[in-house]
């Protein structure tokens, strides 16, 4: 389980933004908010970022979405409960995602807590859930993996992933 203090989470968010901007991407806050910040949802902290890699003016939208939910784990302690990191390339019409959610259900059904989605044609998955190997270690890792997929300039080969069902 990944744990952090509030100060570590503030630094972490700054690191994620800095990483994306270093690659020339634009980082946008969710839901037309004025700033990018952690949002509180009950006893959870939530990160929701839209990252737009640099594309030409006539290109269609490319977006990397980075979402995390951290739950309270003690005095000034948080643990990563869920994540969803997604690349949607509307120019090449594919989607790639790294997820961790509904952990108990996934462990019970598939024996793993994390999984991937791969759609070589967006909206047409060859498999509902694929094994995330290795599991994603957070938003920086998720961003690096998905940005690398986008930089390749080709659709991902989803047949190389092990289908969970």
Descriptions of predicted regions:
Residues 72, 120-123, 159, 164:
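Short amphipathic alpha-helical "recognition" segments used for binding
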Residues 51-55, 68-70, 87-89, 105:
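Short, flexible loop/turn elements at secondary-structure junctions
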Residues 1-65, 133, 137, 143-165:
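UBC/E2-like fold recognition across ubiquitin and ubiquitin-like conjugation systems
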Residues 71-77:
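Short, solvent-exposed beta-strand/turn "edge" segments of beta-rich domains on protein surfaces
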Residues 77-141:
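An exposed acidic His-Trp-rich patch
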């Amino acid at each position: 389980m990944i744990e952090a203090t509030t100060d570590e989470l503030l630094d972490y968010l700054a690191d994620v933004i800095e990483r994306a901007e270093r690659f020339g991407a634009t980082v946008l806050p969710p839901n037309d908010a004025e700033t990018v910040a952690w949002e509180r949802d009950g006893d959870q902290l939530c990160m929701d970022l839209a990252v737009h890699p640099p594309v030409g003016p006539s290109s269609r939208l490319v977006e990397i979405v980075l979402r995390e939910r951290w739950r309270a784990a003690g005095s000034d302690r948080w643990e990563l409960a869920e994540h969803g990191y997604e690349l949607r390339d509307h120019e090449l019409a594919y989607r790639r995602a790294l997820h961790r959610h509904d952990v108990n259900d996934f462990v019970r059904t598939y024996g793993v807590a994390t999984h991937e989605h791969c759609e070589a044609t967006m909206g047409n998955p060859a498999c509902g859930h694929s094994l995330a190997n290795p599991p994603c270690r957070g938003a920086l890792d998720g961003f690096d993996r998905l940005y690398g997929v986008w930089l390749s300039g080709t659709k991902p080969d989803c047949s190389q992933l092990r289908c969970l069902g």
